[in-house]
Amino acid sequence: MTAQPQTLKIRRPDDWHIHLRDDEMLSTVLPYTSEVFARAIVMPNLAQPITTVASAIAYRVRILAAVPVGHKFTPLMTCYLTNSLDVKELTTGFEQGVFTAAKLYPANATTNSTHGVSDIPAIYPLFEQMQKIGMPLLIHGEVTDAAVDIFDREARFIDQILEPIRQKFPELKIVFEHITTKDAADYVLAGNRFLGATVTPQHLMFNRNHMLVGGIRPHLFCLPILKRSTHQQALRAAVASGSDRFFLGTDSAPHAKHRKESSCGCAGVFNAPAALPAYASVFEELNALQHLEAFCALNGPRFYGLPVNDDVVELVRTPFLQPEEIPLGNESVIPFLAGQTLNWSVKR
């Protein structure tokens, strides 16, 4: 029997999908990311979305001001696509190095997406320009038609929206974000070098039974919602395959405790404090630790055309106890896997 590894050294990872929020929440949650990750693709869905170069620069300044001393962290800013976004603003932001990518939220698909796009073909001129300049398109892949069941919205999005976009703009770099279904995993595997996908720790570790059987667990509620076990297993198989189309994107999305534990709770899982140990645990369960570094630190930079990080992080086989709550002023945030112990810890 092969001895279990006691340490894992990998290049410092990046998080290719995160919500850092703003103000007190930003300063509370950012250190959990900046301590471990070198870079992160920062989502633009603030209450006032990031739609201009000026607002992206201002937000980046606020993020950098919240980075603790001793942490080396680069936020990669994104532009929130709207029905009326000026193509010149998008182009200028990308060419100046302010925008790393642009984010497509179908209107009302998730938190703070009311400003999102209601008529996707109407913004095809933006996609045409993005294809021309090599700017990646990041997609929250769910249809928002009220007649479509919430568990079917990702699969329906592939046929109705994503495939037509890829047919019309074959060299547009697209990240199918936080995929949750076998349909999406198979679609990405069958794609080409212009299509990638991020996968969250919660969608690899849990399915909808974990969220709903024996009581509702609001801290597992996120969008896209957890699916049935067959979809979870397909995601696990996809990342274990070693395919370079899949890369780390936590979709860490904090909300104050009272906004999660309510009669109409918010969607989002705050997984940043345990993200890397959680991914390591999954890859070990799948006998795929040989692919962990590529998933966490190599595939994303390759897709974005960015250099990989020079330094390394070390994971050690030391039990890691996730706190029950994290203080947030007079409130708190409940982290992913609260009160649970993981097998791996990041060496500090």
UniProtKB/Swiss-Prot annotation:
The modification N6-carboxylysine is found at residue 103. Keywords: Hydrolase, Metal-binding, Pyrimidine biosynthesis, Zinc. It catalyses: (S)-dihydroorotate + H2O = N-carbamoyl-L-aspartate + H(+). Coiled coil: none annotated. The active site is at residue 251. GO terms for molecular function: dihydroorotase activity; zinc ion binding. CDD domains: DHOase. The lineage of its organism: Bacteria, Pseudomonadati, Pseudomonadota, Gammaproteobacteria, Enterobacterales. The keyword Metal-binding applies. Its cofactor is Zn(2+). Zn(2+) 2 binds at residues 103, 140, 178. Zn(2+) 1 binds at residues 17, 19, 103, 251. It comes from Yersinia pseudotuberculosis serotype O:3 (strain YPIII). Disulfide bonds: none annotated. Homodimer. Pfam families: Amidohydro_1. Signal peptide: none annotated. Catalyzes the reversible cyclization of carbamoyl aspartate to dihydroorotate. This is Dihydroorotase. Binds 2 Zn(2+) ions per subunit. The gene is pyrC. GO terms for biological process: 'de novo' pyrimidine nucleobase biosynthetic process; 'de novo' UMP biosynthetic process. Belongs to the metallo-dependent hydrolases superfamily. DHOase family. Class II DHOase subfamily.
